[in-house]
Curated annotation (Swiss-Prot):
GO terms for biological process: sporulation resulting in formation of a cellular spore. This is Type-1Aa cytolytic delta-endotoxin. Kills the larvae of dipteran insects by making pores in the epithelial cell membrane of the insect midgut. Acts on mosquitos and black flies. Belongs to the cyt1/cyt2 endotoxin family. Active after proteolytic processing. It comes from the Bacteria. InterPro entries: CytB_endotoxin-like_sf, Endotoxin_CytB. The lineage of its organism: Bacteria, Bacillati, Bacillota, Bacilli, Bacillales. Disulfide bonds: none annotated. Keywords: Plasmid, Sporulation, Toxin, Virulence. The keyword Lipid metabolism does not apply. The keyword Repressor does not apply.
């Protein structure tokens, strides 16, 4: 499959987080308990920093949409599209779910880069008009990191390792994009994504996969795009601002 992305996979195969990131801010968020790490890797493309608190609040809200997975994954957590739709109806100020997806993507003994491109095509459909060049770069890096460079992330809060067999590794991976740019206009888009990944390889191999390696995959992708009118940080209660500063930034 041809790679149509602005940032070629070959340019980020070693460490995608070291590629140029425009105005994007990559932050790990904390939930109410300061000892608990948010299980969504939050990637924010915010043109106006006055709206960064809004991105944090949305990420914290959708943290509650992570649910236990199927039997093959043990106690692993994964963003649930169905639960996310429920959460979206409770968020204030009121927003709207613009699109959502629950889709399986598979491949048999093909390069990891092929699976990455398949997943990218699904998520580009969800993101839609918010796809400026820098957002495509961030999306490409995030999806690449979902399947490669796992040894550097194996103990991070956004990845959960499920049950293993002699020839299969199961894991979940959770990412959230918050986007406010010229394409989004007067709203912020929040796009949480949950992956259930079954790969026909032992964990020690999976941890060191590059985009040139080959493997068989069965991947379930659950995601939605939530649009909320822009909310200035000054409109949030001071307690929310203090909590964000102390527990997040």
């Amino acid at each position: 499959m041809e790679n149509l992305n602005h940032c070629p996979l070959e340019d980020i195969k070693v460490n995608p987080w070291k590629t140029p990131q425009s105005t994007a801010r990559v932050i790990t968020l904390r939930v109410e308990d300061p000892n608990e790490i948010n299980n969504l890797l939050s990637i924010n493309e915010i043109d106006n920093p006055n709206y960064i608190l809004q991105a944090i609040m949305l990420a914290n809200a959708f943290q509650n949409a992570l649910v236990p997975t199927s039997t093959d994954f043990g106690d692993a957590l994964r963003f649930s599209m169905a639960k996310g739709l429920e959460i979206a109806n409770t968020i204030t100020p009121m927003g709207a779910v613009v699109s959502y997806v629950d889709q399986n993507v598979t491949q048999t003994n093909n390069q990891v880069s092929v699976m990455i491109n398949k997943v990218l095509e699904v998520l580009k459909t969800v993101l839609g008009v918010a796809l400026s060049g820098s957002v495509i770069d961030q999306l490409t890096a995030a999806v690449t990191n979902t399947f490669t460079n796992l040894n550097t992330q194996k103990n991070e809060a956004w990845i959960f390792w499920g049950k293993e067999t002699a020839n299969q590794t199961n894991y979940t991976y959770n990412v959230l994009f918050a986007i406010q740019n010229a394409q989004t206009g007067g709203v912020m888009y929040c796009v949480p994504v949950g992956f259930e990944i079954k790969v026909s390889a032992v964990k020690e191999q999976v941890l060191f996969f590059t985009i040139q390696d080959s493997a068989s995959y069965n991947v379930n992708i659950q995601s939605l795009k939530f649009a909320q009118p822009l909310v200035s940080s000054s409109q949030y209660p001071i307690a929310d601002l203090t909590s964000a500063i102390n527990g997040t930034l």
